Each structure stands twice: as C-alpha cells, then as structure tokens.
C-alpha cells in the first residue's frame, strides 16, 4: 500500500510540474517582448494572419491593457462581443475564433503577477461569461482544422492557466472542447493534435495519456520522404 501511495504522489507531482512548465511557456515575460518585437516587426500583414506559428507568436506577446479594457466594457450580457461575426461560415479566417483568442488574452493578463488585472474579480467574471457562451453554443467551423486544432490549441492554453478558477461544469466543457482533437494525421497536424490531447490529459490528470501524447509528438521528429522533416532538414506539410 505504501508503494502504491508513493507512486500516486510522484505522479501527481509530475503532473503539477508539467502544468507549471506549460504556464511559464504561455505567460509572456519582458525578455519575450524584446525578442518578439524584433521578430514580428519584420513580418508583413499577410504573414501575420496566415501562418499558425506566427499566430502563436502573437499570442505570446504581452496584451495591451487599453485593448483589454475595451474587451471588458463591450462584452454583452450573453458573454459575446458585438464586433465579432459569430455567423461567419468562412473556411479560412473563421471569425468566431476571435472569441477564443480574446479569452486567452484575458486569461493571460488575469494570470500574470504584477499586471493591473492580476486575479481581478471584474476580469474573472468576464472570462467566466465568455467561456460559458462558448460551452453552451458550441460553435463549429466548416473547416475541420479550427474544430480539431485551432480552437482547442488556443483555448487549451487558457484552460490550463484558468484551471484553478474553473467550476466543475466549466471543466467538463473544457474537456469536451479538447476531445475534438484525437491522435492521427501526419506532419505538423499530427503534432498539433497530439499537443491538444496532451492538454486534455493534463486537465483530466491522466498521466498515461500525457505519455501517449508525448510519444506521438516525439515520433514525428524523424526524417522521411512523406510529410514532416526531410533529409535536407526542410519541413514539408
């Protein structure tokens, strides 16, 4: 019995450590801002919106407090924002995704020690409303990529940061969102999907699934002739 308890305790500690590492990667630092300014200023407007890696770089950029204030003051009673076209049916640049990006921005500022909104009751209320609308409405894009990769990837980061504040109902909603991602595909899509599964595993405190997701990602770090890393070290998708 003592051995079993020790194993469970060690597993819980490992899950906590992984979650802390994720949080450190998600939250911006002053060093991040310096390097991101140099990188992002060199990109064209088209590049800034068309490449997922660039989108993720912008998500690491420190949030503008003035823009955040606008998000707080313009949110509707239902938890939406009037400038987002929630009826959009485009397969690329799907507008409802902006709702998820705003949730992440709000959660980042709420979770950053030293920010003017750190653990702000006003901010927390807005986040709960935004999450509640998404969980209740369950928006679906005609493009599978947003449903299985884009939205879970953005919201997954928010879920991990906001986990201590989530209600049981919100946790169930978060896991449902993350369950849209399953192991499969090849190349970068395979890595993104496995990364989303890993986040779900952390929310479920499922160490076995964490290891499966880790191994799925690691399996793609090889050279080959199909999608992924090529013999000349280029990457094809």
Q: Each predicted region: which residue ranges?
A:
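Intrinsic disorder/low-complexity signal
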Residues: 11-13, 50, 55
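Short N-terminal segments immediately surrounding and downstream of signal-peptide cleavage
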Residues: 12-28
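Conserved donor sugar-nucleotide recognition element shared by glycan-biosynthetic enzymes
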Residues: 64
